[in-house]
């Protein structure tokens, strides 16, 4: 009798003060796809509620939340504080695993990809950068996570 692996569904999240980039992947397939962005809510609670709706709609089992670790040890940004609180709010609101994943320079890398490789203007890059950054975060997690079988 075969033992099929149960598929896990991941949501990659690149949290920003104005927009939140989103990416999606199903494991074991393991391909991250950008799915757009949403506007950040007026409060963290409102933002969590928006994300919970997406989590439920897509039947997400694991959220990979980009965590902007500081370049220098010992520093913590206001954005990082918001992300830690958002992580707690998501875990309180729905039965989902939230993993904080190093996202340093993911937005800068996404910006370079869209500007250089795709040649998109600044106006056309708006919003796309966030979802590409979320895809980079999720791809990094899927490629490097010790939690997933190879």
From Swiss-Prot:
GO terms for biological process: rRNA 5'-end processing. It is found in: Cytoplasm. InterPro entries: RNaseH-like_sf, YqgF, YqgF/RNaseH-like_dom, YqgF/RNaseH-like_dom_sf. Keywords: Cytoplasm, Hydrolase, Nuclease, Ribosome biogenesis. It holds the Pfam family RuvX. Its EC number is 3.1.-.-. One of its GO terms (molecular function) is nuclease activity. It is an enzyme of class 3 (hydrolase). GO terms for cellular component: cytosol. NCBIfam families: RNAse_H_YqgF. Could be a nuclease involved in processing of the 5'-end of pre-16S rRNA. Belongs to the YqgF nuclease family. This is Putative pre-16S rRNA nuclease.
